């Protein structure tokens, strides 16, 4: 990859503490990115709240800050270091959320910091439940029946229409954080309140339950020239309803027909191109082996 001549100093946001959705793979990928970018001649400024990581070792970045990952502290660091670019997508959900918040607050524009590795509007299309749903509708890709709620009261009304059990998915979270499956109104009130608090924008998707369907995934990579490749096809052994972090999986898929795999690949390519993902992306699908429905 040729070096961009308009960039000298790059700010990288670390993933912070190791929790569900913010696991050690982000530390590994962030460390490799720091090393690769430094070899290309870039100066690296790293911000991470977790000192117990490889990426915060003294020889990984040129300048390392062990600071809380929030907008105020990032703004202070940007003001002091004046990076030319921000690389947020190696910090997991924390990095993506902070990038969106910094952009919305006008910090990136004020200090002339360009975002590399991902576009800010791509984060919104992928993370905001309404935007993502509209994008899928334009592509003709079916999704589970769902509605967005901004309060517990709204969620209760939607769940009554969809019928219990339902799944709650907070926006701008990863790994199921703050959400879950609920079987009655009492559970919904507790989980929805937690999900609204966990969501960056106070938004929760109330979705029909499709437990028991096959859970299938594709890892795809797209570059800036719109070239897309499939890294692997993944078949979860346990059905939908069991968290992927607790499920065995096989790569490649062993029991899924070639026709279904081709359809999943077609959908994945449409999705990453529509959202304009640059880099790696995990696309998750549910497949009903009885009806053949894919969402």
Residue ranges and their predicted role:
Residues 1-295:
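N-terminal beta-alpha lobe that positions the nucleotide/phosphoryl donor
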């Amino acid at each position: 990859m040729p070096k961009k001549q308009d960039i000298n100093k790059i700010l990288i946001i670390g993933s912070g503490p190791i929790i569900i959705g913010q696991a050690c793979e982000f530390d590994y990928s962030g460390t490799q990115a720091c090393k690769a970018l430094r070899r290309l001649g870039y100066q690296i400024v790293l911000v991470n709240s977790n000192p117990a990581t490889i990426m915060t070792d003294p020889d990984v970045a040129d300048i390392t800050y062990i600071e809380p990952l929030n907008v105020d502290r990032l703004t202070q660091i940007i003001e002091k270091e004046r990076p030319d670019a921000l690389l947020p997508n190696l910090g997991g959900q924390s990095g993506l959320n902070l990038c969106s918040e910094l952009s919305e607050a006008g910090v990136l524009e004020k200090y002339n910091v360009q975002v590399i590795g991902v576009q800010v509007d791509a984060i919104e299309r992928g993370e905001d439940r309404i935007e993502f749903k509209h994008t899928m509708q334009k592509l003709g890709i079916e999704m589970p029946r769902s509605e967005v709620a901004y309060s517990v009261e709204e969620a209760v009304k939607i769940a009554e229409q969809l019928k219990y059990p339902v799944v709650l998915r907070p926006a701008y979270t990863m790994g199921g954080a703050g959400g879950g499956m609920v079987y009655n109104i009492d559970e919904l009130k507790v989980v929805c309140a937690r999900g609204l608090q966990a969501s960056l924008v106070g938004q929760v998707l109330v979705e029909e339950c499709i437990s028991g369907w096959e859970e299938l995934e594709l890892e795809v990579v797209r570059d800036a020239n719109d070239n897309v490749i499939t890294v692997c096809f993944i078949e979860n052994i346990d059905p939908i309803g069991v968290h992927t972090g607790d499920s065995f999986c096989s790569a490649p898929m062993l029991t899924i027909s070639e026709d279904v795999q081709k359809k999943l690949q077609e959908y994945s390519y449409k999705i990453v191109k529509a959202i304009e993902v640059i880099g790696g992306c995990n696309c998750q699908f549910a497949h009903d082996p009885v009806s053949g429905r894919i969402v």
